[in-house]
Structures are given as structure tokens and as C-alpha cells.
Amino acid sequence: MLPSIAKHVASHQINPLKKHGQNFIFDSSLCDKIVRASHLAENSRVLEIGPGTGGLTRSILQKNPESLTVIETDERFIPLLNEIKEYYPNLNIIKQDALKINLTDLDYDKVTIISNLPYHIGTELVIRWLKEARLITDMTLMLQKEVVERICAMPSTKAYGRLSVICQLIAKVEKCFDVSPTAFYPPPKVYSAIVKLIPLANPPSIALINRVEKITTFAFAGRRKMIKSSLKNLVPNIHEVLTQLKINDNYRAENLAPQDYLRIAMSLSVNKL
């Protein structure tokens, strides 16, 4: 029988490294709650980034997935994870930097992603995975609360921005619950939250999403400017484009819905961007 998460970590004399922004979760009930929020089906193929202490890893394995692949860059955790594997042979351990791995490298038809993501690379990973959405069943992720609020934000709200637009064009997004800093050791300075993203059946093409990314970069760089002003350096005839699409050119970036940005991207030929 495996020891508790805390005892298991202590037996390996592993301490969180500040330089890596590490904060450990020892509460197995929280890990179970995250997995429940994912509605993980038996016999799923699951991917976890940054398993660390293995708490979330254990909770996932207890749901009997077909396989769980974990990607861990900190070699201190590999022996601990190997001990978990002795009880769960369907656990696959890859020592690698998550930013250096694409989902296509893992030979998945479809994968469910459940992770407590390292906050310094969380947003980058989310965007990268969304561009490989055809390979993903769904994602249940722990991120900084501020990032989750940006992912889920509606137009005309303070949190709404580029991340909101991109995520909502590719996936259905839902905030599940907040996580207090006291759930971690040591406690971080910010709250965390769990978000679930389910890729849409027919998301826009990657080429279109890349175009939307470029448009929103210009639009939200001048967040308080009218859209006709913030986009004029990118699209000289932006007034005509917005008029044709029946989008009010006095709107600011935060007033346009994700679909409005997609319509602008679709109306522009590649050579115009």
C-alpha cells in the first residue's frame, strides 16, 4: 500500500524549489475533487503534465484509465513516480520538458488532459494544446485564478482579452471551482482555479486561429482605443471591413465577441495580414 502523499514525498526528502515556482499539494481529497470535475470515463487515455508529488496522479489512476502518461522535468520526482507505477502498471513516465513535446509525439488518437499546470508555462501550454484540439477529448486544468477568469471572461468585462477569444473560439470553457493558497505547501501568493475546456466539434482552422491571434494582438494592445484605430496599422481599410461585417467601428477591443474576431479574420485574405 502506498503511503500518504506527504509521507511519500518526505521519504524521498524532496522539498519544493522556489526557483521552479513549486508548490506541493498533499490533500488527496482536493486531487479527487479535480478528477471528479473532469468526469473522467473508465478506459480513457490520460495525459498529466508536471505530476510532481503524484497526488493528482494517484487520483487519476484510481479511476482506472486505459493509460496515464505523465511528463515530468524534475528528476527528483522520477523515483517516487516509479514507486506509484509498481501499483499501477498503466502509468507511463516521461522525463522531459513539456514545452518540448507535442501531442502528436505521443501517438494519441484522443487524449484527456488533467493537470495542475506549472503557472509560468500554463497559458503557453493551453494555447498550444488548443491548436491540437483534434487530438483532445477534454482538458481539466489547474491554473492561476486570474488566468482561468481570463479564459472564461465574457465581452465587455475587465478580464476579457486575447486569451478569452482564442480559447472560446476553439473550446467550450467552464470554470469549476477556486482553490485557496492554503491548499498548497508552501502557500502561493495567489488563488488558483480549475477550468474545463471541451474542444468544439468543428473549430476554426489553425490558419484562421493564427490570423485571429495577430488581429487580437493589435486590438488589445490598444484596449481603450476604438477598434478602427487599434487595427488601422494592421488593416488599412479596417473601416470598410467593419462596415461590411456590420461591426460598430466605435467599439473597443473588449466589446467584440470571439465570433466577431473570427469574422474579421475570415474576411481578410492571407496577404492582407
Curated annotation (Swiss-Prot):
The protein's enzyme class: transferase
PROSITE patterns given in the database record: RRNA_A_DIMETH (PS01131), SAM_RNA_A_N6_MT (PS51689)
Keywords: Cytoplasm, Methyltransferase, RNA-binding, rRNA processing, S-adenosyl-L-methionine, Transferase
Swiss-Prot/TrEMBL catalytic activity: adenosine(1518)/adenosine(1519) in 16S rRNA + 4 S-adenosyl-L-methionine = N(6)-dimethyladenosine(1518)/N(6)-dimethyladenosine(1519) in 16S rRNA + 4 S-adenosyl-L-homocysteine + 4 H(+)
HAMAP family with a match to the protein in the record: 16SrRNA_methyltr_A (MF_00607)
Binding-site positions, S-adenosyl-L-methionine: N23, I25, G50, E72, D97, N116
Molecular function GO terms recorded: 16S rRNA (adenine(1518)-N(6)/adenine(1519)-N(6))-dimethyltransferase activity; RNA binding
Main localization, broad class: cytoplasm
Sequence similarity: Belongs to the class I-like SAM-binding methyltransferase superfamily. rRNA adenine N(6)-methyltransferase family. RsmA subfamily.
Protein name per UniProt: Ribosomal RNA small subunit methyltransferase A
Listed EC numbers: 2.1.1.182
Compartment list: Cytoplasm
Entry function: Specifically dimethylates two adjacent adenosines (A1518 and A1519) in the loop of a conserved hairpin near the 3'-end of 16S rRNA in the 30S particle. May play a critical role in biogenesis of 30S subunits.
One Pfam family here: RrnaAD
SUPFAM superfamilies recorded: S-adenosyl-L-methionine-dependent methyltransferases
CDD domains: AdoMet_MTases
Keyword field contains Metal-binding: no
